[in-house]
């Protein structure tokens, strides 16, 4: 999601009990600026205007052994490819409020290379049922990116 200086109006909606595909179809029928797709065991909600450039950044293969998606993300963000792309796109790492599960379970992520979005999906799938969120904030001179699990 790419946002500007003002927030969009909030809508009330309670999709509890509905099948996920139906929920995603309802969301994208109400807000035509988004589409959804399934890829490698993950579901992504993407802007119809095009995927943010940072998510399209090519990432080499890696293996991460960890107990937290946040730690896997932190390791991913230190990779040269991501640092270089953020510099070229003039994006700074934004403030993230961290939440964590007190029951840490070890898991491994083996990624054979692809885009940053595919790497984030690989982390989510490896950990089980994680959800990740991507936001670019562009307000005046401020250009930040927030990626969180």
Enumerate the predicted regions with their spans.
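N-terminal targeting/assembly segments of extracytoplasmic apparatus and virion spike/baseplate proteins
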Residues: 1-149
């Amino acid at each position: 999601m790419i946002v500007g200086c003002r927030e969009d109006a909030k809508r009330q909606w309670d999709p509890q009990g509905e099948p996920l595909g139906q929920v995603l179809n309802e969301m994208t029928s109400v807000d035509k600026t988004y589409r959804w797709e399934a890829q490698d065991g993950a579901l992504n909600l993407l802007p119809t205007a095009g995927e943010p450039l940072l998510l399209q950044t090519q990432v080499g293969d890696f293996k991460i052994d960890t107990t937290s998606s946040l730690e896997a993300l932190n390791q991913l963000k230190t990779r040269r490819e991501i640092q270089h792309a953020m510099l070229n796109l003039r994006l700074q790492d934004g403030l993230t409020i961290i939440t964590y599960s007190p029951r840490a379970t070890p898991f491994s992520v083996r990624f054979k290379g692809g885009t940053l979005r595919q790497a984030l999906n690989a982390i989510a799938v490896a950990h089980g049922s994680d959800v990740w969120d991507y936001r670019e904030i562009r307000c005046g001179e401020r250009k930040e990116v927030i990626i969180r699990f």
